Amino acid sequence: MKNTLTASEKRRFLDIIAGFRTVKILVIGDFILDQFVWGNVSRISPEAPVPVVDVKRESYMPGGSLNVANNIRSLAGSAFPCGVVGRDLYGRMLVKTMRHQGIETGGIVYDPSRPTTLKTRVIAHSQQMVRFDREKTEDVSLANLNKILKFVHQMIRTMDVVVLEDYGKGVMQPFLLREVVKLAKKFKKPVLVDPKEKHFDYYNGVTCITPNRKEAYGGYERTIGPWRKTPELEAVGWALIKKLKLESVLVTLGEDGMILFEKKGRVTKIPTAAREVYDVSGAGDTVIATIALSLAAGAKMHEAARIANMAAGIVVGKLGTATASPEELTEAVRRAGSR
């Protein structure tokens, strides 16, 4: 399939995007504070063969599952994130960035025994040079999982879609997944998962997972078993749907676009919509946020995937943890070639 739209598809997609503003999405996952250190490099250190960064400024953004929430908000939807932060300096900074970005803070669970996850990226001359991670990845306590579930119970009736964002920082555990999926099915809410490779066996019964190519193959090996010969990607997609009882699997393929497998037998190959790629960090968050919004606004899964592909094409053309706006997405639909 070429990356083109018919006139009727354009009208349909524009109607879906216009519907984002009434959508409510519950986002559960690992909260991360993203720190960006911006500077210039003009010399090598005399102490060791490493560049010296002359720091010009620093910025902070809500990351992890909060980047999904931020993408939803940027696209005019309403996000209700739930996750864990520490009672520390970075936790306070994270809450401040959430409020600054207009992200709801009612789902925060505080844990004084854990540090707030901080990812520091050093960027010079538009290039990321190094990243530092400060975190604790052990499982979140059962007491705090129950606090998350209490929030889910309070909110799920009024939500349109549930997104589970698994960064492997301790929130996503089998108990939590089972309870959330059970509640979502009770109230007929789709559940979308941005997966962690090592946790694929947790995702049984969700609506859709959105792995990248590496995660799809790693998840296949974890849930189905090792292979003697590397299987084709289509075999991986169908096997995951069958094994995990999914409605669909959307595999993101970087510069090769995406491929969607649907339980009923449909395969949709979607070429990349990106014109230029500056930074792929956060693109997966944009994809799952846009799919959630589109489904809630009445899209079919293959339509949601194509709209999400356009949104991802916008954010990879920006540096840093970026988002797309409804205006940018609307323009991308209008700009798409005709067929």
Sequence positions of predicted segments:
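Conserved phosphate-binding/catalytic loop of the ribokinase/pfkB sugar-kinase fold
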Residues: 108-114, 121-156
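Substrate-binding N-lobe of the ribokinase-like
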Residues: 2-14, 46, 50-117, 332
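Positively charged, low-complexity intrinsically disordered leader regions
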Residues: 1-42
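Short acidic, glycine-rich surface-loop motifs adjacent to enzyme active sites
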Residues: 158-171
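A short, aliphatic-rich alpha-helical micro-motif
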Residues: 20, 156-157, 200-204
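Conserved post-catalytic alpha-helical subdomain immediately downstream of the catalytic base
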Residues: 243, 247, 273-336
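Conserved phosphate/ATP/ADP-binding segment of small-molecule kinases
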Residues: 169-267
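Structural motif
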Residues: 26-28, 131, 160-163, 192, ...
